[in-house]
Each structure stands twice: as structure tokens, then as C-alpha cells.
A protein has these predicted regions:
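Buried hydrophobic packing segments
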Residues: 45, 49, 102-110, 135, ...
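Metal-dependent amide/peptide-bond hydrolase catalytic core
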Residues: 2-5, 197-392
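Histidine/acidic-residue-rich, glycine-tolerant segments that coordinate divalent metal ions
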Residues: 65-68, 85-93, 97-98, 104-106, ...
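Acidic/His- and Gly-rich active-site-bordering loop/insert found
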Residues: 2-119
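Hydrophobic face of alpha-helices
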Residues: 14, 18, 42-46, 103, ...
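Short Gly/Pro-enriched turn/cap motifs at secondary-structure boundaries
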Residues: 58-60, 129, 162-165, 311-313
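Non-cysteine beta-strand/loop elements that form the S-adenosyl-L-methionine
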Residues: 79-81, 176, 330-334
Length: 392
């Protein structure tokens, strides 16, 4: 009788749990919840792991919608990151329901082979990826301290094995002036909305001088409440992105000058507050990414060639913070979205369609087989364990 390999066993587990995983994906999709408010999604995601015998730690780092569920006691601790927050107004247009379900599928598959491979499987529920930096907060809380390597996937319109992302920071800028009647005594007012306008004009002019890879985008979240009242308070929210964290910091310094210009020109006071932890750029582990690429090909997928991956436009993710700390991957698994891209309503609909269901199942298998390959490679296993020891 032929020997059943660990990879085959893991794949069989995913096939056996297909119905549960797709049901989880659809259930999360049907009840979208925003950052730090994903209570139902968090509970659903950890439930399948708990039923399998995972030891669940609720609310690590004091985050109510985070969790860590562990199985096994091997020295090679593998973190599998689940996301489940949605977007305001358009639900799961980033497909985090697929991410959560594939993370659970990967964890269940690896639990079946954990003892034989010397693994500890750590399913980590990470809230607030869209805004809030849940993974960055969990890193600060020590949740990743014992993790040797971390994996997750993200849906998208194409397959990318070694996905990149942009570094990101987000700030809220509040201008405080003085109210007055806009017709009777406008000269007694200090117009906070004008400060916003000056800042936006300065930012618009700055865009001509931005370095390659730098970009910024923002919204006015408060600008007055009545046309006959000089606005005494106005507020902006801006995101700054760049190819790496150093370039992002340089952009942020220049943006702060634009914000200050609004205050100086109008006489307003101003305050800049970081809206969330900064997101670092993804640094995919090359060995893990190449194994995942081979798994994509084995599944009949056609990943973007390695030599053009860096040129594929992407957003930002707090998984970048994880991959800057330890070996990890964040591949993109393609689904048929009818031409829509993430953060469009068309992608919301696609994220619960047949192609999305296929991504859940195939993604679970590909991630699980990639981890098995790591565990079975003495050289790579030693490498990631040595890197973890160096962090201690």
C-alpha cells in the first residue's frame, strides 16, 4: 500500500471540510462588519478551530475581535493569519471572507499532520486590516513572538505568488479656528475650512514633485455645519503611501509642511494625529513564495512571472509589518470578478461566487502544502528557526 504523504493528508482534510469552509466564507460575506467591530466574524472564524481541538486565546493584546488558536506542541510555530473586516458601504469588496475561510482551511489541514511534522499551528485572527493595523498591534502585544513563519493569502483579479505592497501611514488633521456670523462679522472669525483648502492646494502642488512610488489621497471629514457660520473646526484624513517605509517617512515630512501651511495662512491652530499604526511594505520570503508558485502551477493556475511581480500595482497591508519581522508570504489568489478590482462593488459580488469558493479550497491546499514543504526541508526549517532565535 502506498504511503500517504503529509501533503496528501493535508489536501484530503481540506476536501473533506469543503462544505464547512465555503459556508464560513459565505456567512462572513453576508454579515459584513467594520474594523474592530467584527464580533460575529471573529466568533465564526475561531469556532471551526475550537471544534477541532485548537486551544483558543480570546482578545490577545486587549483587542476584542482578535484571537489566537493553537494546535500541537512542535518547535516550528507557523502563524496563519485570518482577516475578516469589511469596508464601509461596500461590504467584503476586499474578499476578507475568503481570507478567513482559507486561513481556517489551512489550519485544519495542518492540524492533521502537526505531530508528525513537529509543528505548532497558530491560527491568528487579525482584526482591522482595512484601517487600524490589527497585526501591528498584535505584534506589539507579543502575539507573534514565538512564530517562526507566517502565511496568508488575499483574493484578487490575478494570481501573484510573491505579492508586494506599499508602505502606508494615515493621519487625521484637525484645524481649530473661531466661529462668527458669515455676513454680520466674518472678520471676527478664523476660518478652519479655509485652512483645509490651503492644505489641499499645497498637497495638489506637491504631487508634481513626488518621488516615484509615492502617492497620497485624502478626504475632508468635517468642514462646517451651516453656510452662515464661519467654520470653527475642520478636519482632514490623509493616507500616504510609498514603495518602502523610508520613502513613506520622507513623504510624510513633506505632507506635514502642507498641513502646517493651512494653519499659518489662516491663523488656525492645528493638530496631527496618527490614525493607525504605520503599515510596512511586504517583504515576501523568497523560498516560501517559490514553493507557493509551484503549488499554483500544480493547481493549473498561471501566476504572474517572477520578474514582473514587483511592477504589479497593489495597495497596502499590515501583513507587511509581519513579513518585516519574520519569514512570511501574502500571495494573491485570482478569482473571476468580471473585470472588477478590489474595493469595487463588483468585487463584493464576486467574493461569494463560485470562483471565490474555488479560491478558498485551492488556497487552503496551496498554503498547507507550502507549510508542509517548509517543515520537511531540514535546511529551510533550520533557517526560519534560527531567525526566530535571533529575534529572541
Amino acid at each position: 500500500m502506498p504511503t500517504i504523504t503529509a501533503s496528501t493528508r493535508a489536501e484530503d482534510v481540506v476536501a473533506a471540510r469543503r462544505g464547512d469552509l465555503i459556508e464560513l466564507s459565505h456567512s462572513i460575506h453576508a454579515e459584513p462588519e467594520l474594523a474592530f467591530d467584527e464580533h460575529r466574524s471573529c466568533a465564526k472564524t475561531q469556532a471551526l478551530a475550537a471544534d477541532r481541538g485548537f486551544a483558543v486565546t480570546a482578545a490577545p493584546g486587549g483587542l476584542p475581535t482578535a484571537f489566537r488558536a493553537d494546535y500541537g506542541s512542535g518547535p516550528l510555530v507557523i502563524g496563519i493569519c485570518a482577516e475578516y473586516d469589511a469596508l464601509p458601504g461596500i461590504g467584503h469588496a476586499c474578499g476578507h471572507n475568503i481570507i478567513a475561510a482559507s486561513a481556517v482551511g489551512t489550519a485544519l489541514a495542518l492540524a492533521d499532520v502537526a505531530d508528525g511534522l513537529g509543528l505548532t499551528v497558530a491560527l491568528i485572527g487579525t482584526p482591522a486590516e482595512e484601517s487600524g493595523g490589527g497585526k501591528a498591534l498584535l505584534i506589539e502585544a507579543g502575539v507573534f513572538d514565538d512564530v517562526a513563519a507566517a502565511v496568508m493569502l488575499h483574493p484578487g483579479p490575478i494570481d501573484i505568488a510573491a505579492a508586494r505592497s506599499l508602505a502606508l501611514s494615515e493621519v487625521t488633521v484637525t484645524y481649530t479656528g473661531r466661529e462668527s456670523h458669515a455676513a454680520v462679522a466674518p472678520y471676527l472669525g478664523v476660518n478652519a475650512a479655509d485652512a483645509v483648502t490651503v492644505a489641499q492646494v499645497a498637497i495638489g502642488l506637491l504631487r508634481q514633485q513626488l518621488a516615484p512610488g509615492q502617492m497620497t489621497h485624502g478626504i475632508v471629514t468635517e468642514g462646517g455645519s451651516a453656510t452662515n457660520v464661519i467654520p470653527g473646526r475642520a478636519r482632514l484624513q490623509y493616507t500616504m503611501r510609498a514603495t518602502d517605509s523610508a520613502s513613506r517617512r520622507a513623504l510624510e515630512d513633506r505632507m506635514r509642511g502642507c498641513f502646517e501651511a493651512g494653519a499659518v495662512a489662516t491663523g488656525c491652530a492645528y493638530e496631527i494625529v496618527e490614525a493607525a499604526p504605520a503599515y510596512a511594505e511586504l517583504a515576501p520570503d523568497r523560498w516560501l513564495a517559490e514553493v507557493f508558485r509551484a503549488e499554483m502551477v500544480r493547481m493549473g493556475r498561471a501566476p504572474v512571472p517572477a520578474d514582473v511581480e514587483a511592477g504589479v500595482p497593489l495597495g497596502s497591508t499590515d501583513m507587511g509589518n509581519v513579513t518585516q519581522l519574520l519569514p512570511g508570504i501574502h500571495p494573491v489568489v485570482g478569482i473571476d470578478a468580471g473585470g472588477a478590482v478590489i474595493h469595487q462593488p463588483g468585487f463584493t459580488a464576486a467574493a461569494a461566487g463560485p470562483s471565490a469558493d474555488q479560491a478558498v479550497i485551492e488556497g487552503s491546499i496551496m498554503l498547507a502544502r507550502t507549510v508542509v514543504a517548509l517543515a520537511e526541508s531540514p535546511a529551510e526549517r533550520d533557517r526560519v528557526l534560527a531567525l526566530k532565535a535571533d529575534r529572541a
